[in-house]
């Protein structure tokens, strides 16, 4: 089965040790089996301790936390079989950051099984280098202390720091397993609203491979080889003079997927600090509205649907468009001479509310393309 959202570094990273908060320092005794004779110590440990990344095991070896036959060793040391290994398991920095921090959370829904939260732009989901405190995870642990007993504190997918919107968090291990399985099977429906530069010509599907940008390892890009399949469905809600209001549905959940795909389609998201075009031509009033978004791109996880882990029923949630994006839309409508009387969220919902058309989930193309009409 192909992993989708759960293997995405933005939603979830298989390359990082994302353990539960209960992990503590302890020792593990191992005997190198004869079938692994001839292998390097780091490679042997990676096979014997698959729950830990090879990079983490290598760092333990270099730190002297791995003893082979009562002696410190090096990652490249060859094993002959039968060696006695003692590994001191040390909590990762991420794990040490699993501490509750009270913060105001916009809880959209909560029961004994799941929490649905509306994440604001600017909030990091999970502790990592440069953001060891003040993350959504820290706030969730304060709100629901029992999450400390759930692997990964119940988080099964992520949003970029500067993307706002809906996330679901599992409160129990069975619920987490259910949600992960749904993400892997692509049955979780995620709909985003965004403002894109330019006039998006038609509704369509963007289907590519996404991987690390070979010229900038801090960015993602559409690549021909070595990437992961990524599919985004785009629906145009409204067109203005210099921008378009769009709705994006995800089949997959790659890192920065919508942002990368819209850039590749020559319609990057407004105000995107990484993939956007700060010189996109537009009127002064619109420029000010875009500037007022600050560091965040005009992207919001608007709707989330999944099968409830306990009841088995399909549940759907929506989060109103944030004020900063709403202001930009109002300015764009006014400039375009459109009805500017849509003064509140209810009126916007009546005009642009999500429908229940599931046609986006039909995989009727099997080509490497950038943008095709549906």
Swiss-Prot record:
Single biological process term from Gene Ontology: enzyme-directed rRNA pseudouridine synthesis
Keyword match Cytoplasm: yes
One Pfam match: S4
UniProtKB keywords: Cytoplasm, Isomerase, RNA-binding, rRNA processing
Compositionally biased intervals (Acidic residues): 8-17
Active-site residues annotated for this sequence: 160
Similarity comment: family membership: Belongs to the pseudouridine synthase RluA family.
Protein task: Responsible for synthesis of pseudouridine from uracil at positions 1911, 1915 and 1917 in 23S ribosomal RNA.
Protein's name according to its UniProt entry: Ribosomal large subunit pseudouridine synthase D
Phylogenetic placement of the source organism: Bacteria, Pseudomonadati, Pseudomonadota, Betaproteobacteria, Neisseriales
Gene name, Swiss-Prot/TrEMBL: rluD
């Amino acid at each position: 089965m192909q992993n989708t959202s759960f293997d995405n570094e933005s939603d979830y990273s298989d390359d990082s040790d994302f353990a539960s908060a209960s992990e503590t320092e302890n020792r593990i005794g191992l005997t190198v089996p004869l079938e692994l004779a001839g292998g390097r110590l780091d490679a042997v440990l990676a096979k014997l301790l698959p729950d830990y990344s090879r990079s983490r095991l290598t760092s333990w070896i270099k730190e002297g936390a791995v003893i082979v036959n009562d002696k410190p060793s090096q990652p490249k040391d060859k094993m002959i079989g039968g060696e006695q290994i003692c590994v001191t398991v040390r909590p990762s920095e991420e794990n040490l950051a699993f501490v509750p921090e009270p913060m105001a959370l916009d809880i959209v829904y909560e029961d004994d099984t799941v929490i649905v939260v509306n994440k604001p732009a600017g909030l990091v989901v999970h502790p990592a280098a440069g953001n060891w405190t003040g993350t959504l995870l820290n706030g969730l642990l304060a709100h629901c202390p029992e999450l400390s007993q759930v692997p990964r504190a119940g988080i099964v997918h992520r949003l970029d720091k500067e993307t706002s919107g809906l996330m679901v968090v599992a409160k129990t291990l069975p619920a987490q397993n259910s949600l992960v399985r749904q993400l892997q099977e692509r049955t979780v429906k995620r709909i985003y609203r965004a403002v894109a530069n330019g006039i998006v010509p038609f509704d369509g599907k963007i289907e590519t491979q996404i991987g690390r940008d070979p010229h900038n390892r801090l960015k993602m890009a559409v690549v021909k080889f070595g990437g992961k399949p990524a599919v985004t469905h785009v629906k145009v809600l409204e067109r203005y003079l210099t921008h378009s209001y769009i709705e994006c549905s995800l089949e997959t959940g790659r890192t920065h997927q919508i942002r990368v795909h819209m850039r590749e389609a020559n319609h990057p998201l407004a105000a995107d600090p990484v993939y956007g075009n700060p010189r996109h031509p537009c009127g002064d009033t619109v420029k000010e509205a875009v500037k007022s978004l600050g560091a965040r791109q005009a992207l919001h996880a608007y709707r989330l649907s999944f099968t409830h882990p306990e009841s088995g029923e399909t549940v759907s949630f929506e989060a109103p468009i944030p004020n900063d994006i709403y202001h930009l839309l109002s300015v764009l409508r006014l400039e375009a001479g459109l009805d500017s009387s849509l003064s509140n969220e209810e009126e916007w919902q009546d005009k642009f509310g999500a429908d229940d058309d599931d046609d986006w989930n039909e995989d009727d193309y099997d080509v490497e393309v950038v943008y095709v009409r549906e």
